[in-house]
């Protein structure tokens, strides 16, 4: 589980912009992670710039692009990129060891359709991703901020849902997953109130885990212990 931003929101769900809304979490790198950053960053790393990426230039082709916010150590993201070579993948993570681990795994797997940001997710989304350019946005297991007084810090808020909607193509999907039932209820409430989305669940609640989201070791262990995971998928329709 990785916290993608230290941004806070007010009671109405409005993002409280700060001059510096995050601190890049350096952490302690293993030799392998440090080496992966040094050797793989020139080809897979994306240096933040407040101008929209040209995805065709970045990937050298036209293809649907999937963006993941807060990929943790990156194992699932690398697996997804490996299993869908016809798609482009962009990952955003503030935790440097996670970035190093992701790059190491991607290099070992021979993945060429993955690019990575070591930066604040909100800044990347607002300034570096063009509107209407993404086929899917993924937010898996974000910090649940389970204490009620901290709920306003949850990343899924009204303004965030609108930001994601703008970045998706018509027909693009915002896919969320959480192992906190209360957060899934919060996500559902926010997304049902958001304009321009349609819930892909037949009964208007959650969906079964789709094939494109790998089952993590943590999640498999949770299943054996009877813990739940909730997936929500909302399509941009306007």
From Swiss-Prot:
Family membership noted in the UniProt record: Belongs to the class I-like SAM-binding methyltransferase superfamily. TrmB family.
Residues engaged in binding S-adenosyl-L-methionine: 68, 93, 120, 143
Gene: trmB
CDD domains: AdoMet_MTases
Alphabetized UniProt keyword annotations: Methyltransferase, S-adenosyl-L-methionine, Transferase, tRNA processing
Native organism: Shewanella sp. (strain ANA-3)
Protein's name in the database: tRNA (guanine-N(7)-)-methyltransferase
SUPFAM superfamilies: S-adenosyl-L-methionine-dependent methyltransferases
Any GO CC annotation of this UniProt entry: tRNA methyltransferase complex
Positions contributing to substrate binding: 147, 179, 216-219
InterPro entries: SAM-dependent_MTases_sf, tRNA_(Gua-N-7)_MeTrfase_Trmb, tRNA_methyltr_TrmB_bact
């Amino acid at each position: 589980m990785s916290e993608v931003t230290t941004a806070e929101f007010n009671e109405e769900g409005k993002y409280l912009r700060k001059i510096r809304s995050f601190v890049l979490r350096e952490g302690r790198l293993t030799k392998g992670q440090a080496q992966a950053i040094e050797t793989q960053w020139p080809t897979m790393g994306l240096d933040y710039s407040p101008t929209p990426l040209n995805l065709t230039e970045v990937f050298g082709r036209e293809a649907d692009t999937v963006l993941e916010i807060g990929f943790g150590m990156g194992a699932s993201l690398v697996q997804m990129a490996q299993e869908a070579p016809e798609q482009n993948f962009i990952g955003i993570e503030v935790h440097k060891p996670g970035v190093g681990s992701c790059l190491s795994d991607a290099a070992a797997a021979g993945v060429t359709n993955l690019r990575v940001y070591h930066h604040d997710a909100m800044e990347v989304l607002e300034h570096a991703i063009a509107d209407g350019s993404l086929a899917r946005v993924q937010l898996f297991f974000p910090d649940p901020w389970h204490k009620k007084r901290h709920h306003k810090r949850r990343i899924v808020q009204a303004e965030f849902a609108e930001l994601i909607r703008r970045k998706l193509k018509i027909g693009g999907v915002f896919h969320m997953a959480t192992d906190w039932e209360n957060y899934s209820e919060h996500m559902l409430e926010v997304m049902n109130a958001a304009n321009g989305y349609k819930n892909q669940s037949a009964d208007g609640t959650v969906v079964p885990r789709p094939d494109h989201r790998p089952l993590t070791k943590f999640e498999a262990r949770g299943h054996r212990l009877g813990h739940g995971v909730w997936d929500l998928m909302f399509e941009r329709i306007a």
